[in-house]
Every structure is written in structure tokens, then in C-alpha cells.
Amino acid sequence: IQSTSMDQGSLSEDSMNSFIRTLIQAGIWKNKVLRQTARTMDGIETTXKXTXAEPXVIAXKDIRLGFQSIVSVDAELLRQQRRFSSPRVLXNENTPLEPPPLYLMEEPMVLTXTSXXXRFAXXXXHRGEYSVCDSESRWVTDKSSAVDIRGHQVTVLGEIRMGPS
């Protein structure tokens, strides 16, 4: 990157470094997504390479076909983020055999409630902030979008791959 003497006076070094870092990360992310994206059309799996004009066309096809994107996430990246290190979020490489019970009352052990447990205040930093299912007691698997607990429209991912693929 070259800059003229006029540009050097208007931008601080920190903002320029931040801008360059953002450009590098965006380029790496774009290349990684292009390499990992596989499209299935008419039963034949092909690797899609998008040009600058194609992303809107591909996105429109995905919406019409009901395609849910598959996002690859590194497990170590999730462990490093503080907001994902809560007792309600567990990153695991193995697929669960069945969905976890949504409420404690669904578990037969809790229904007996013969022993009394002492309650004490513990610092629960982000507990419940990233709840997926708050009022439903059944799993919904055919949704591609939903409304989160703050009222924002969000995309529901069909599958998340963790680790090297």
C-alpha cells in the first residue's frame, strides 16, 4: 500500500493498521469460504467459485431452494471467545445422539425431588444471554430464520462443522 503526503497527515497509524488488518482478514475469509463452499445441483456436487457479480445470484438461488449454509468454525476459536465460554455452551466435535432436555422438569430424576439442595448466589456472567429456545418445549428443525431474544431477525444455520474439514 502506497500513500501520498496528503494521506499521511489525515490518518493515524493505528487506524491504518486496523484497516489493513481488516482487509487481510476479509481476504482470508473470502478465500476460505470460496474453497469450502460446495453446491449440490441435480444430485451432483460441484464446487462453486463466485465472481464479483455472482454472490447476489447465488444468494437468490439459495433462498429459492431453501438452502441452509454450512459454516465451518474452528473449536479453538470458540473456546477463546469469552461470550462462548459459559455453562450453557459446550463445543464438542461429536454429534449428539438426541437433543438435550429443554427444561429440567422433562428429566425423570428431577420429578421425584426428594432431596433438598442448598441455593447460593454464584456469579453467572453471561448465563441465559445466548439462549436458543426460551418458550418452546419442542425442537424445530425446518426453520431457516428466527427472531432472537432481543427481537432481531437471525439466520438459523443448518449445520456447523467444527475442526479441520
Swiss-Prot record:
Q: Which GO terms describe its biological process?
A: cell surface receptor protein tyrosine kinase signaling pathway; modulation of chemical synaptic transmission; negative regulation of neuron apoptotic process; nerve development; nerve growth factor signaling pathway; neuron projection morphogenesis
**A molecular-function term among this protein's GO annotations:** growth factor activity
Q: What is its main location?
A: secreted
Look up keyword Nucleotidyltransferase and say if it applies. Answer: no
Q: Which UniProt keywords apply?
A: Cleavage on pair of basic residues, Growth factor, Secreted, Signal
Mind telling me which InterPro entries this protein's record contains? Cystine-knot_cytokine (IPR029034), Nerve_growth_factor-like (IPR020408), Nerve_growth_factor-rel (IPR002072), NTF3_N (IPR045815)
Task: Show the propeptide residue ranges.
Answer: 4-119
* Position of the signal peptide: 1-3
Give an example GO cellular component term for this record: synaptic vesicle
State which residue ranges cross the membrane: none
Entry's localization field? Secreted
Q: Which family does it belong to?
A: Belongs to the NGF-beta family.
Q: What does this protein do?
A: Seems to promote the survival of visceral and proprioceptive sensory neurons.
Q: What is this protein called?
A: Neurotrophin-3
User: What organism does this protein naturally occur in?
Assistant: Tropidophis haetianus
Record lineage: Eukaryota, Metazoa, Chordata, Craniata, Vertebrata
Q: Which gene encodes it?
A: NTF3
